[in-house]
């Protein structure tokens, strides 16, 4: 893969550096107004800190016409038809290159049930896009065909969440910050583990949804919409109990009485010794293969 879509479209200059170092050539993120200013999201941009990393900025309004407003009967554009939507896409400003749409799969049958016509809308949309003289393309195709219009610098992390487009939905209150802080505390020790199940559970614990469910922001519609918990406090208590159990499992493997640096040095020594043993075994096998086989035979006994 050459293009990265980060969770919740999270992006900033530090993330850009890490993503480019991983070998990606492009990234998808949010067309946040406070980042773009007077610029349109309908162009290819490049990172200000890594110019070779090209960016597509989500068109929030057109994306949320589908993800948030399609089923809203109080919306003045309701009902939204495929031909109407295609005409909106075609009415972009002159000279604009590309419109990047991004939404959760939940819009298909969950946020908008089949009875809303959402599936019929998407079945019909490609035909009306073609009639409007537009074409669809993958991010890699877009980056291969279009040159960046300008550079984008993002010092503070942006996302596609709510009006502020920040990380507030996941790290905005003391519950979320406490849970995340405890998770991060065990990063190095967990990385040292050779237990695949522990590393798998560690990845599960990093899911952004766990922290979204702890949101207490009244304006955060997604938290209450998706959360299986009765309250943010229930979500916090459940997560901390699971995290505590996880810590005990890691503790059994690598006791916290041993400092991370000391433990890392011990593991490195064991790894080096293992490599030395493997090399010696290979050398022994080679010597055995080169040693001439002992000749055997029978002689006739003299009479």
Feature names for model-found ranges:
Residues 1-7, 66-81, 109-116:
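The substrate-binding groove and active-site-proximal loops of carbohydrate-active enzymes
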Residues 12-22:
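Distinct, well-ordered alpha-helical segments
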Residues 4-11, 140-142:
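Short, solvent-exposed turn/loop segments enriched in Gly/Ser/Thr/Pro and often Arg
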Residues 20-41, 46-54:
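Acidic, His- and aromatic-enriched active-site or binding-groove loops in soluble protein domains
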Residues 5-9, 29-31, 57-58, 102-104:
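Short His-Asn-centered micro-motif
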Residues 43-53, 57-58, 72-75, 87-295, ...:
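Active-site and substrate-binding clefts of carbohydrate-active enzymes
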Residues 3, 26, 98-100:
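Residues at the N-termini of beta-strands
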Residues 29-38, 56-77:
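Positively charged, amphipathic and often flexible ligand-engagement surfaces
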């Amino acid at each position: 893969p050459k293009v990265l879509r980060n969770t919740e479209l999270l992006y900033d200059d530090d993330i850009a550096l890490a993503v480019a170092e991983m070998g990606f050539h492009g990234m998808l993120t949010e067309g946040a107004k406070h980042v773009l200013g007077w610029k349109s999201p309908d162009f290819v941009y490049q990172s200000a800190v890594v110019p070779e990393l090209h960016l597509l900025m989500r068109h929030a309004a057109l994306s949320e016409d589908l993800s948030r407003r399609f089923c809203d009967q109080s919306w003045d554009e309701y009902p939204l038809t495929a031909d109407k939507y295609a005409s909106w896409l075609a009415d972009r400003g002159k000279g604009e290159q590309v419109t990047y749409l991004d939404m959760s799969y939940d819009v298909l049958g969950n946020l908008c049930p089949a009875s809303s016509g959402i599936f019929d809308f998407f079945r019909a949309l490609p035909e009306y896009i073609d009639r409007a003289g537009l074409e669809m393309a993958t991010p890699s195709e877009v980056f291969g065909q279009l040159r960046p219009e300008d550079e984008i610098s993002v010092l503070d992390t942006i996302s596609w969440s709510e009006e502020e487009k920040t990380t507030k939905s996941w790290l905005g209150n003391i519950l979320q910050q406490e849970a995340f802080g405890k998770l991060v505390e065990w990063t190095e020790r967990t990385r040292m583990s050779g237990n695949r199940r522990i590393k798998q559970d560690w990845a599960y614990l990093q899911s952004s949804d766990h922290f979204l469910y702890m949101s207490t922001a009244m304006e955060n519609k997604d938290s209450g919409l998706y959360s299986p918990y009765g309250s943010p406090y229930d979500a916090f208590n459940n997560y901390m109990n699971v995290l505590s159990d996880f810590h005990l499992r890691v503790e059994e493997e690598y006791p916290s009485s041993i400092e991370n640096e000391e433990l890392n040095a011990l593991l490195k020594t064991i790894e080096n010794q293992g490599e030395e043993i493997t090399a010696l075994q290979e050398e022994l096998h080679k010597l055995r293969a080169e040693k001439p086989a002992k000749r055997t035979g029978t002689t006739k006994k003299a009479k």
